[in-house]
Structures are given as C-alpha cells and as structure tokens.
Amino acid sequence: MHGRRHLAASLTRALTQAPSRSISSTPSLLQTLDPSVPSPSPPPAAEPGRLAELRRRLQADAPSLGDFAYSVEVGTRQRPLPKPKWMKETVPGGAKYAAIKAKLRELKLHTVCEEARCPNLGECWSGGETGTATATIMILGDTCTRGCRFCNVKTSRTPPPPDPDEPSNVAQAIASWGLEYIVITSVDRDDLPDQGSGHFAETVQKLKALKPEMLIEALVPDFRGDPSCVEKVATSGLHVFAHNIETVEELQRNVRDYRANFKQSIDVLKMAKEYAPPGTLTKTSIMLGCGETPDQVISTMEKVRAAGVDVITFGQYMRPSKRHMPVSEYVTPEAFEKYRALGVEMGFRYVASGPMVRSSYKAGEFYIKAMIEADRSKATTADSSA
C-alpha cells in the first residue's frame, strides 16, 4: 500500500512540475514551413481580473498547430496490444469436431463455442487430452436482448420467439452423442415474461429423461434477479448452476450491459444455493485483462466465496472484433497460477485459471465431474451406514 502511494505521489509531482507549453513559445507547423508567417500575439502583460487569468491559462494549455498535426499523423486511437506467445490458438479439426458440427447444423442448434468465438473450440469438440468431446449448447435462440461490451453474440430488443421444439431437439442431440457431461447456456431474454427460465428448465428435464446418468451444467443469465426464475432452473435436475459475474465489481458498468450488476449476480448465485437440492454446485467466471487491479480481483474473489460459490474460473479477455472493448493487458500465466492458488486457499472446491480458460472449459468439467461423483459416493456410503 505504501509503495503504491509513493508511486502515485511521485507521478503527481512529475505532472505538476512539467513545464507548460504555450502557443507563443512553441513554433507552429506553419511557421516551420514558412518563416514569413507571423507568430501568434502574446497575451496582454497585465489585464486585471479573473478574465485575464482565465485567458492566460487557456493560452498556456492550448496545443499548437504542430501538436495538432502530430496527433493526426500518429492517430488518436489506441493501438491494439500484440498477442503474447502463450495466447496462440489451435486450428479446429478432427473426426469428432466434424461430427459434432454436422449434427448441430442438421438440428439447427447453436453453440456458444461458435457464437462467442471461443479459442478452445477445437480442443473441446475434438476431445482434447481427456478424449471426451464437449460442446456448450446455447438455447433460446442466437440473439440476445443485451449488449455487453465483450460479447460477440447478436443483439436485438425484439429477437425471434423461442422455438417450442428446441428443448426436445437439444435433448435428442445431446443424448445421441454419448457424452457424460454437458453445458447448456442461453442468451438473455428480457423480452419474455419468465426471462426464458421455463424453456431452460424444460430442456434440462427432457435431457434427464433421456439420459438420467448424464451430468448437466446450466450456465444461466441473471433473470433480472427474479427468485422464481432462479428457483425454476435450480430445481430442474441440473448438477451445476453457473452464472458468470464476468469481471470485478468495480468494472461492471464498463464491461456488462447496464441491466446487469454485481449485486444482482451475487444474489442469483446465493438463491441458487438456497433453492437447489443438496450437493448442487454453484460456479462463476471472471475475465482478466479488462483493466482490473490485483486488489480488485482479490476483493471480488472474497465476495464470491462468501456467497457460497464452489467453483470459479479465470480466463484472459479476448476482443472478438474492433467493435468491442479493447484488451487492457495480457495477464501472464504466472499471475493466473497465483490466482488459482489463492482461490484454493480461500476455500473454493475447484479453480480453473489460465489464459485460454473459459467458463465452460472442458478441463474444468472433467474435474467437476469427479467432484460430483465423489459426493455421490459419500452420500451412498452414508445412506448405507444409516
């Protein structure tokens, strides 16, 4: 803390002691090109009153034509940061990848993997190191009613109505893949009376009817904080209730849609823990590289843990296009590892942290699956001994 204060004080001194540049003391670009152009007239030597002082300050702070020409030459827009070597992506491919993509097209289903341009798409769809292919299915259409500054999903105030056959189609598709763990997510649907929670719950229930042994994670929107919507999904038969806070508390308005906020998201996670059956895990995710400080990350982690959240993931924010907010910094793998260790120390049951990690990252699902099965085993043992 003292070090940061000392740095801030030294920067302040440097700024206040920097010589000001006035129009009269700096040659303009026109004077450089043509010496015959007269210099701007200096301000009056002594003009009484506040008006004179205001004029003097404005003239002292004003940029010269040379300054203006320089700003036009170099541009005023911030240049995007170059990607470091640890952010290189792999090219999607493989038989499993092709099969999943073909099935999705056949049933006209959407995945957040594609819509959000996830860098792990190739690894997850092809099976990766675990050999189990994973896709995060996006329901309620492909058009969101919100417009977060980081997200590449299409937006509209009046998206098309949900497909009534979608819950059945999604359940049949997932059941046919032979997966053990699936993530179902959705766009925000503020246009619907129940925010789409009934559609979400129906999808989970139909899938459970076809594949009772399948583990289901639901990555849900905030439902505007409506307790009835949260309860409907939390009691639908899922194993993991996930809702992302996306960024630290201080940057919520800069990163997320104005209808989302930190308290509302924390309340949703708390309600899910309250409504869901015992043993249901809660999970959230934070993007790094949005302009947050380490102190803000730690403070946010503490509040998330206090809400009873079991699993947290950290990943690097990647700018989907030039229309979206720029990357503030590329956080190093070493920093991600420190956040992981700190999360474990705080009591999170599982922490996935790395530049390429996303909230639905398959490595996280692999370990969460093991956690759920371990909890089931303990419950069975306890029932047998009772």
Swiss-Prot record:
UniProt feature, compositional bias: Pro residues: 37-46
Predominant location category: mitochondrion
GO biological process, one term: lipoate biosynthetic process
Coiled-coil segments on the chain, per record: none
GO cellular component: mitochondrial matrix; mitochondrion
Residues that hold [4Fe-4S] cluster 1 according to the record: 113, 118, 124, 360
Official protein name in the record: Lipoyl synthase, mitochondrial
Catalytic activity, EC: 2.8.1.8
Cofactor(s) listed: [4Fe-4S] cluster
Catalytic activity: [[Fe-S] cluster scaffold protein carrying a second [4Fe-4S](2+) cluster] + N(6)-octanoyl-L-lysyl-[protein] + 2 oxidized [2Fe-2S]-[ferredoxin] + 2 S-adenosyl-L-methionine + 4 H(+) = [[Fe-S] cluster scaffold protein] + N(6)-[(R)-dihydrolipoyl]-L-lysyl-[protein] + 4 Fe(3+) + 2 hydrogen sulfide + 2 5'-deoxyadenosine + 2 L-methionine + 2 reduced [2Fe-2S]-[ferredoxin]
Enzyme class: transferase
Organism domain of life: Eukaryota
Start and end residues of each stretch annotated as Disordered: 1-48
Family to which the UniProt record says this protein belongs: Belongs to the radical SAM superfamily. Lipoyl synthase family.
Domain Radical SAM core residues, every copy: 129-349
Miscellaneous information on this protein: This protein may be expected to contain an N-terminal transit peptide but none has been predicted.
Sites where the protein binds [4Fe-4S] cluster 2: 144, 148, 151
SUPFAM superfamilies found in the cross-reference section: Radical SAM enzymes
Annotated localization: Mitochondrion
Entry keyword set: 4Fe-4S, Iron, Iron-sulfur, Metal-binding, Mitochondrion, S-adenosyl-L-methionine, Transferase
Alphabetized GO MF terms: 4 iron, 4 sulfur cluster binding; lipoate synthase activity; metal ion binding
Pathway listed: Protein modification; protein lipoylation via endogenous pathway; protein N(6)-(lipoyl)lysine from octanoyl-[acyl-carrier-protein]: step 2/2
Keyword Protein biosynthesis: no
Pfam families listed in its UniProt record: LIAS_N, Radical_SAM
Comp. bias (Polar residues): 13-34
